Amino acid sequence: MGRLFGTDGVRGVANRELTAELALALGAATAQHLASSTGPGRRVAVVGRDPRASGEMLEAAVIAGLTSQGVDALRVGVLPTPAVAYLTGAYDADFGVMISASHNPMPDNGIKIFGPGGHKLDDATEDRIESLVAAGPGLRPVGSEIGRVIDAEDAADRYLRHVSKACTTRLDGLTVVVDCAHGAASEVGPRAYRAAGARVIEINADPNGLNINDDCGSTHLEAIRAAVLAHGADLGVAHDGDADRCLAVDANGDLVDGDAIMVVLALAMQEAGELASDTLVTTVMSNLGLHLAMREAGVNVRTTGVGDRYVLEELRAGDYSLGGEQSGHIVMPGLGSTGDGIVTGLRLMTRMVATGASLAALASRMQTLPQVLINVQVTDKAAAAAAPSVQAAVDRAETELGDTGRILLRPSGTEPLIRVMVEAADEEAAHRLATSVADAVSAAG
């Protein structure tokens, strides 16, 4: 058996790679790990999911695994991933389980596990759980020692009270289009923005289990651009299937990506004295324009590998207060233990109201260098990335770019893809060099 955990939990096509049997085994193994690492007593796990069709099957299997090992399951239903992380701490649960494949297509699903306080697991803990999956079920409690299932009726309201802390001023007079991706934010997202005072126009907020992320949300911005322009809205915010991401569109329909959002929020926090150590944490995928904008403002930038778990690790290690990814995962540890798209949207709108500036004006503090990202599907990520022909193509591109740009070659942690990213002084060069390297990867993969 290969490694189960990727960069963001366990993922696969539901009922093919991610089966009910595997979900049950993961639930049981997580419960066993908890029993071996803590003292005696009744244990509780928060369990949530996004609305994709396979979620109910996997939820039932995970809960069966947990309860078979004596852990009570606190079922919160369809809620965003950051809600499950928050509620794990708010309910003083021993751990949390989120069933979601985030921005992936509907047939996929995933299982993400949070430790105490809603923090993501480290590699050693994931390895321990994997070893317990391989070993099979442990001792089975009987009678009153079997875990129970409890429905947390107040879960959504508790989460909404939490995210309201992100909004330090009323948003009255602001019109926002919210794209919920037919996902986990479909109910709580519009409620959160309306509670803050904004006029909300919601789109793609009618999940039926089959339409999550289907040409909508943060990976398909055409609909929200059109809606912002049609309604004359001040901005649009787009979430993904589990609402841990937020991308924005300004009143002109132009994209404000995670890099630009981080610049806006970093400057706001610096001004308020809330940017710890005057430092922003981001990944190697962030545009060079972010680094230049932060240098001009006197903000340090700490760079990590790709994946919000690495951003989170650096935030915790340095006790920093803001980090994120270009993809829209924005983390503010003072407001949550993981990326929260709704919190990000509220903070962005708060800055607009506080300054009286448009989103376009705020985002203009960062000048984006042309960046081209090509996803290349391969059968063997490691072999393709290491192929001599690919390395030669990368070397040629780096020689041409010199100090005026950069190239990154990165295997996806969740999909059979290698991502080729090139930044250059002009778009033609970025496209040409990215295509050249992508062709080499495709031929090798």
From Swiss-Prot:
Keyword Glycosyltransferase included in the entry's annotation: no
Cofactor note: Binds 1 Mg(2+) ion per subunit.
GO molecular function, a single term: phosphomannomutase activity
Residues with PTM Phosphoserine: 102
Listed GO CC annotations: cytosol
SUPFAM superfamilies, per the entry: Phosphoglucomutase, C-terminal domain, Phosphoglucomutase, first 3 domains
Cofactor(s) in the UniProt record: Mg(2+)
Gene3D superfamilies listed in its UniProt record: Alpha-D-Glucose-1,6-Bisphosphate, subunit A, domain 3 (3.40.120.10), Alpha-D-phosphohexomutase, C-terminal domain (3.30.310.50)
Keywords of the record: Isomerase, Magnesium, Metal-binding, Phosphoprotein
Post-translational modification: Activated by phosphorylation.
EC number: 5.4.2.10
InterPro entries: A-D-PHexomutase_a/b/a-I, A-D-PHexomutase_a/b/a-I/II/III, A-D-PHexomutase_a/b/a-II, A-D-PHexomutase_a/b/a-III, A-D-PHexomutase_C, A-D-PHexomutase_C_sf, A-D-PHexomutase_CS, Alpha-D-phosphohexomutase_SF
Catalytic activity annotation: alpha-D-glucosamine 1-phosphate = D-glucosamine 6-phosphate
Record bears the keyword Phosphoprotein: yes
Range of residues in the leader sequence: none
CDD domains: GlmM
Pfam families listed in its UniProt record: PGM_PMM_I, PGM_PMM_II, PGM_PMM_III, PGM_PMM_IV
Residue numbers annotated as active site: 102 (phosphoserine intermediate)
GO biological process, one term: peptidoglycan biosynthetic process
Enzyme superclass (EC): isomerase
Binding site for Mg(2+): 102, 240, 242, 244
Known function: Catalyzes the conversion of glucosamine-6-phosphate to glucosamine-1-phosphate.
Family note: Belongs to the phosphohexose mutase family.
Protein name: Phosphoglucosamine mutase
Native organism: Mycobacterium marinum (strain ATCC BAA-535 / M)
